[in-house]
Amino acid sequence: MIDFRPFYQHIATTHLSAWLETLPLQLKQWEKQTHGDYAKWAKIVDFLPHLDADHIDLKSAVKSESVSPLSAGEQQRLVYHLKQLMPWRKGPYHLHGIHIDCEWRSDFKWDRVLPHLAPLKDRTILDVGCGSGYHMWRMVGEGAKIVVGIDPTELFLCQFEAVRKLLNNDRRANLIPLGIEQMQPLAAFDTVFSMGVLYHRKSPLDHLSQLKNQLVRGGELVLETLVVDGDINTVLVPADRYAKMKNVYFIPSVPALINWLEKVGFKNVRCVDVAPTSLAEQRKTDWLENESLIDFLDPCDHTKTIEGYQAPTRAVILANK
């Protein structure tokens, strides 16, 4: 099973130390309620070999390599174990000669977001809904002091720990399997990311307030979410599914989203990027057995979802507490 004690020790002397009042008990309770496959996935992480990487690149990719490459047989065994953790949603990863070609080219999103951010060097960062942690490693590559991701999905935790193991067990990033609604308000993070989460929330303004409660005064929110065309009063509430997803509740226009952020008290709210999701960014690969974007769009008109809504378009909004 995954040991969180190194994380507790890591934050004990930082301004995240107040979290230790609640977090260890929460994670003990979490361990008692884990999914039936969690033990199997955690065991796969244990099975992965301890490989010493001579070169790690987190600045331009998530990549590890050694002077002495793995043999064909060693690579085959490593691929076998990593594929037991499918589906791999967010990536890509290049680990000891193995290319984990994930469904999402999350590096595309990072390239859109990064130029607009306050420098991440020496910052304490929270990544809400972090998935398997691809962007967390890129934050480490930008010099962040501490990166904490939260995501309750157990498979993502095990994927993250597998990648960590193949990055020389780097402890600068940590994934905690909780949702933001389970976090006490710490007001301790210099930057808070919420990317691809807001439209899954039944109460989006509550989510925005929860994000604000984790920021230091003046800290930066990085919000990336689905949007639709329209004015300040435009919000799409899908009747049933959106792009075959059942758990999509509110998709605002950019002006409406800016209004929401100002409503809950954020300042200096600005939209820095709007981009449609392309078939190059989200697609089927050998590391994903499920459907992908092409299956979610109208086959005759890719500007619409299969339900007839505007096809996925994502905006990046920055704001300060």
From Swiss-Prot:
SUPFAM superfamilies: S-adenosyl-L-methionine-dependent methyltransferases
Protein keywords: Transferase, tRNA processing
Gene Ontology molecular function, alphabetical: methyltransferase activity; transferase activity, transferring alkyl or aryl (other than methyl) groups
Catalytic reaction list: carboxy-S-adenosyl-L-methionine + 5-hydroxyuridine(34) in tRNA = 5-carboxymethoxyuridine(34) in tRNA + S-adenosyl-L-homocysteine + H(+)
One GO BP annotation of this record: tRNA wobble uridine modification
EC number: 2.5.1.-
Membrane-crossing segments per the record: none
Residues annotated as binding carboxy-S-adenosyl-L-methionine: K90, W104, K109, G129, D151, P152, T153, I180, E181, M195, Y199, R314
InterPro entries documented for this protein: CmoB, Mo5U34_MeTrfas-like, SAM-dependent_MTases_sf
Pfam family, one: Methyltransf_9
Stored Gene3D superfamilies: Vaccinia Virus protein VP39
Superkingdom assignment: Bacteria
Subunit structure: Homotetramer.
Function (record text): Catalyzes carboxymethyl transfer from carboxy-S-adenosyl-L-methionine (Cx-SAM) to 5-hydroxyuridine (ho5U) to form 5-carboxymethoxyuridine (cmo5U) at position 34 in tRNAs.
Family, as annotated: Belongs to the class I-like SAM-binding methyltransferase superfamily. CmoB family.
Listed NCBIfam families: PRK15068.1, tRNA 5-methoxyuridine(34)/uridine 5-oxyacetic acid(34) synthase CmoB
Protein name as it appears in the record: tRNA U34 carboxymethyltransferase
Native source species: Pasteurella multocida (strain Pm70)
